[in-house]
Amino acid sequence: MSDLFEDPAPSRNTPEFTVSELSGAVKRVIEGEFGLVRVRGEIGRVSRPASGHLYFDLKDDRAVMAAICWKGQAGRLSVRPEEGMEVVATGRMTTFPGQSKYQIIVEDMAPAGAGALMAMLEKRRAALAAEGLFDAARKRPLPYLPRVIGVVTSPSGAVIRDILHRLRDRFPSHVLIWPVAVQGEKCAPEVAAAIRGFNALPEGGPIPRPDLLIVARGGGSLEDLWGFNEEIVVRAAAESRIPLISAVGHETDTTLIDHAADRRAPTPTAAAEMAVPVRLELLAGLDGQGARLSRCAAETIRRRDQRLRDLARALPRLESLVAGPSQRFDLWSGRLSGALGQSVAARRARLEPLGAHLRPRLLADLVARQKDRLGDRTRSLETCLGRRAERARDRFEALSARLAPAFARLIAETERATRRDAATLGTLAARLDAAPEARLARLSDRLEALDRLRQTLGYRETLKRGYAVVRADGAVVTTKAEAGTAAVLEIEFQDGRLSVGRGKTRKPKEEPPAQGSLL
């Protein structure tokens, strides 16, 4: 009965391990059996604690694997892990004895093909668009003639040369270049820092603050342009207080910075064309406006002169204003004299029969009274006529006083417009005279530079470094065979030429026969 309660004897062929020993053995087997591996899967449950390490899961439809990326390596990953992203992780397998699970230590990570990148790009675009970073209301107009243009691009390569060349051809401007990496892990932080750095420049500081920014890069694959799809770059472009043109890739390439920028250019050259107008077209337009201004000024002066003439003709002459009352005065004066004579004669005829009955004194009194009445009426008539003439004169003077300021203002405005137009035309003429001289000076400098380049690249500079030119019959000899067939060779050195004739060809000395062996 006691055997039922005793432990069976352990098998002699089965080794015994502690938990730690077995976990360590499993760890050594996994790490030794699997070296550097690449695992494809979907990212899930991403965790970023304060330590800076990165913890996440790699899963497919049948299994889940824990993944760790240490702090030092997490900052160098080319792709920022996000939940739901399909990636290919490169790392080494290991185990964590504390939880009895296996895991992969990730050293590098890449999206699993362009489809995964496009899916992640679309997800990021939708999230940023939901925040309003791509709204048309946020976009600002570009300045018409920017004094300073800031360019964020690589300092070497065709992009910056194309931009500078196009700006120089169209309208030379002050250009500030902020050199950045346009590809790789440093691209996004450097581009974002450059945009924010230009915006941080103070107005009126030692370094002029740009009026316009251009972020440019040449064409490339989706992976090459990925730095311009990073959230840090998009937010920097959207927060920029300086108008910004995005010129990343070719016309068919689209990045998220294109949506956040104020304008998108299909190529870096097109960005330079958007930034500034053509100077020669502006000068031609200025000449046209100057001619139009001259014509308008001449037409305005002609119209105002004609208006003055019309107003002068519409005014009545002084003689015509006084002629009517004067004629009526003369008429009534003539009639008054005749009427007085007739009245006196009639009254005399009527009074003569009565005179016999009147006493001289009464008659004298009556005549005196009539004479006084006649004098009063004469004076009253003269006063009335004088008042009418005075009113006519006052009316004429009032009309003249009302028209005089208008005439003076019209003449003063015409003189000011004429002086202003003359000054504008003088300035335009001076600028037009100076433009050909400046262009001629630039062309002369360019011609001198090309001549110096021609002299530097000429073969005579090569002769100074110890080389020589061999000619035969006036043609340059470039091979040994050509030199062997020529009768006379002419060798040109730095300080002159030397002719060399062919001598007799020596017959090669025959080698002595080999000495035989006596043995």
From Swiss-Prot:
EC top class named in words: hydrolase
UniProt KW keywords: Cytoplasm, Exonuclease, Hydrolase, Nuclease
One annotated GO biological process: DNA catabolic process
Reactions mediated catalytically: Exonucleolytic cleavage in either 5'- to 3'- or 3'- to 5'-direction to yield nucleoside 5'-phosphates
Source species, domain of life: Bacteria
CC per GO annotation: cytoplasm; exodeoxyribonuclease VII complex
GO molecular function per UniProt: exodeoxyribonuclease VII activity; nucleic acid binding
Keyword Lipoprotein: no
Family label: Belongs to the XseA family.
Role noted for this protein: Bidirectionally degrades single-stranded DNA into large acid-insoluble oligonucleotides, which are then degraded further into small acid-soluble oligonucleotides.
Name the record gives this protein: Exodeoxyribonuclease 7 large subunit
Species name: Cereibacter sphaeroides (strain KD131 / KCTC 12085) (Rhodobacter sphaeroides)
Taxonomic path: Bacteria, Pseudomonadati, Pseudomonadota, Alphaproteobacteria, Rhodobacterales
